[in-house]
Amino acid sequence: MTLGDTLFTLVTFLVLMLAVGKVAWKPVSKMMADRQQKISGDLDYAEKSRKDADALAAKRQEELQHSQADAVKIVNQAKENGEKQRQSLVDAANAEVTTMKKNAQTDIDQARKDALASAKNDVADLSLTIAQKLIGKELNADDQKGLIDDYIKRLGDANGSH
């Protein structure tokens, strides 16, 4: 290669470089800069999305823990309410049993009094009849009452000694 050829090649190369620099370099550089900005924006968006996802996951985990605590609280409250209801039912049943016992005892006492009064009247009638037959006369009310009271007292003493 001669000096003229080398010089021609060098000048052609420089002219071509200037033409490429003026025509193609700016669009290629702009395209590369735009691509770099897009990649940087995508990376920033991906990082933001990852942080948002982490924050959302943490929030969901916290809500899950709160809901579990609420569920435990609800279960414990239900147990307490159930125990209170059970105790209330037991107390009501015990009160009813106590009332029934008192009523039964009252009924027993009344029946005993009625039986004693009936027996007293029967004994009085029987005593009066026997006394009339033995004595042969009618007793007045005071005599009759005295005989009946005496008989009942002896009857009570006899029953009490057994």
From Swiss-Prot:
GO terms for cellular component: plasma membrane; proton-transporting ATP synthase complex. Its main location: membrane. Pfam families: ATP-synt_B. It is found in: Cell membrane. CDD domains: ATP-synt_Fo_b (cd06503). The chain crosses the membrane at residues 6-25. It is a single-pass membrane protein. InterPro entries: ATP_synth_B-like_membr_sf, ATP_synth_b/b'su_bac/chlpt, ATP_synth_F0_bsu_bac, ATP_synthase_B_chain. One of its GO terms (molecular function) is proton-transporting ATPase activity, rotational mechanism. F(1)F(0) ATP synthase produces ATP from ADP in the presence of a proton or sodium gradient. F-type ATPases consist of two structural domains, F(1) containing the extramembraneous catalytic core and F(0) containing the membrane proton channel, linked together by a central stalk and a peripheral stalk. During catalysis, ATP synthesis in the catalytic domain of F(1) is coupled via a rotary mechanism of the central stalk subunits to proton translocation. Component of the F(0) channel, it forms part of the peripheral stalk, linking F(1) to F(0). F-type ATPases have 2 components, F(1) - the catalytic core - and F(0) - the membrane proton channel. F(1) has five subunits: alpha(3), beta(3), gamma(1), delta(1), epsilon(1). F(0) has three main subunits: a(1), b(2) and c(10-14). The alpha and beta chains form an alternating ring which encloses part of the gamma chain. F(1) is attached to F(0) by a central stalk formed by the gamma and epsilon chains, while a peripheral stalk is formed by the delta and b chains. Belongs to the ATPase B chain family. This is ATP synthase subunit b. It comes from Lacticaseibacillus casei (strain BL23) (Lactobacillus casei). The lineage of its organism: Bacteria, Bacillati, Bacillota, Bacilli, Lactobacillales. The gene is atpF.
